[in-house]
Amino acid sequence: MKATDFSKVAEVYDNNSFRFDELAFDIHLEGYIHGQPQQHYNVMDLACGTGIYLDHQMGHFDAHSIEWHGVDASEAMLGKAREKLKRGNLVQGLAEDLPYVSNSFDFIINNYAFHHFTRKSQVLDEVYRVLKDGGIFKTHNINVHDMENWWIYQYFPSAYTEDLERFWQKQRIFRELEDRGFKVRLETNYQMEKLKVTDYLQLAENRDISVLTIISDDDYYAGLSKMKNDLEHNPAKTMMNDFSELVCIAEK
């Protein structure tokens, strides 16, 4: 599978407002804290990127003693995270070779990033290793197998082919976690709605969405040109859009 070069998107990554809208208060972390009362918690954002999740959650959980950790392979993305965050431990490292001793973390979150890992099975082995007994691994991602008519795929068809290679199906995610000894609960949601094409042109032009960085330039500019041509002929053009998300909670 192809990999995104995040050094090329770090500068524009946070221009996508949807990244901020989608990361609300983490009810699963709250549930873990309430269900496992203790004096101190270690929480890791695995593939933390520019620190959006950590920045959102730190304020919500000020009443608790939490040591926040962020790990990412991209120094460019971590540089943006350091600009946001006044505290927390940010480390450059690989998810398949985490720089932590075993049984270190109470809660590990992986937001919109599992598809980037080229050695996913090894990543899950590492997550299991560094997670404490009774700890939680949460992964939250789009569910591409149930959203064939996502606006991205309508204008950039080769992106769908790439994503089918990058994303595990939900059944495999469940099985891989369960085979390692996790107790797994997986939920998906789905929505179909009509979107205005004009509302998504800027997102396409920003080219921060990872799959748009790995398709060929020819495919990318062909899709962008089609969006612009459609809007030139009909500024009010709409399209039906599929969207689905997956949340998986795995308890060690």
Predicted regions and their residues:
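A short glycine-rich, Lys/Arg-flanked "PGG" loop and its adjoining helix->strand segment in the class I
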Residues: 121-136
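Conserved Class I S-adenosyl-L-methionine
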Residues: 21, 50, 183-252
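Short catalytic micro-motifs in class I SAM-dependent methyltransferases
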Residues: 112-116
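Class I SAM-dependent methyltransferase SAM/SAH-binding core
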Residues: 44-97
